[in-house]
Amino acid sequence: MFYLKYRNENFFIVKNNKLIITSYEKYYEFLKEILVINESKDTKIEFNGAKLNSKNTLIIDLSSISSATKIFNSENRLINEYIKTSLDNYSMDYEKENTINFTINEIMKKLYKELQLENVEIDILKLIKSHTSFAINNNDDFFVVLNEIVKSEDLKNIFIIYKKGILDFLKLNELEYIKNDKIILFEICDSNSKFKDGDNILFFDKDIYQITYNNLVDLILSKSKIQDLDRELFEFLLNNIFFYSINKKEVDIMRKHLKEIININDVLNKEFKINLMDTLDYI
């Protein structure tokens, strides 16, 4: 297991090249810090004792549909402007915010033609990092590029931030099976996330406990005063507390919100509401 250090604390844990973030608040705090790598700035984050920076780390953000269409970022404006101009000369449109919506091969073919080069290898990593924004249209493009990036001797870390739902949208499910020491997968969890036993890591304050999801559900259900509590309903409540929360304060806030939702629910009878809210206190 490896640890990412932030503010002199073990911030997140990496297990089997996969990191599961269970709090959106923590995720955005972390993301804001780590994305400065794409602006060629140093970070305050350490990975296995080494500071992360733009020279040794590449961030690929697939955590939302909007960010998935702007995968790679760089401040190399000169090459970026040149590529834009080259594409304009061939009447190829690009979307707002300089997002180029063509495949790697199309762009490289245009560059070959513009530079009058034949059978000359172009450093794909430099090509990608030259774009302010770069969109990849299909699986093949993405994995071809990723395989080329992995070969880079300068890059020691490649962080891919993703959500399962976005992977389905992009048809990039193979991403979860990537096996390379350089690549760390950041899975952003939400209330729809499904885990296998032993797959998830839950964070409580500064202590880290590994517990299977099903065992956790069974444990709390066993303490419930409600007979035959609907497991699906309970898992929804549990997900909304744990997979958005990381410390006691956040759990208390989420518990309060859920109790308010239960209280105004006209479908549930009064006794059921009381027992359900009482069950939440065990969490």
Model-assigned labels for residue ranges:
Residues 36-46, 154-155, 175-187:
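Structural alpha-beta junctions
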Residues 1-74, 264-283:
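Glycine-rich P-loop/Walker A and Walker A-like loops and their local beta1-loop-alpha1 context
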